[in-house]
Amino acid sequence: MQKKIKNREALLSHGDIDGRKIVLDITEKTLQHLDAYERIKSIAHMEGDVLCIGSRRWDLSKKRNVYLLGAGKACNHMAMAVDEILGDHLTRGIAIVKIKEDTDVFRKTDVYVGGHPLPNEEGLRACKEIIKLVDSANEDDLFIVVISGGSSALMSCPIEGITLQDEIDTTDVMLKSGA
């Protein structure tokens, strides 16, 4: 697993070295335990054609399509784990993220960079793609959805009569008033 604290050596170059080591070790373990990618990998896996998530099981050989939908600030990591776990079973994925990272590797998932805290055009485009995908689905399709904090801004899709700019302006007013 990749280390979360990138500047460990610099932090240990001065001050109470022993105390700093203890704090950094605890912090590193905590960050690794909370990592969205690792959390998904710890609860989901494939057994042949069967997807196992916790105690639930889905035989993917009986599904027409398997889709991944995701949004949120931790979506990169969650969606990447699901994409990796499903492998060739995944038909298509759509992930709306705050920042596309250089380390993001997806096989079959389209990644959109939505706006946060203010919605943007790319988030709107992604939502329209999600709606098209959901509308084309039937009972033989399986959707796996991963949502994390920030998804309400990243997944902007105003109703008819409300523009994206209306939503941006409303969100901006709410943020400036402390909401």
Where are these regions (language model features)?
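N-terminal loops that bind phosphate or other acidic moieties
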Residues: 1-179
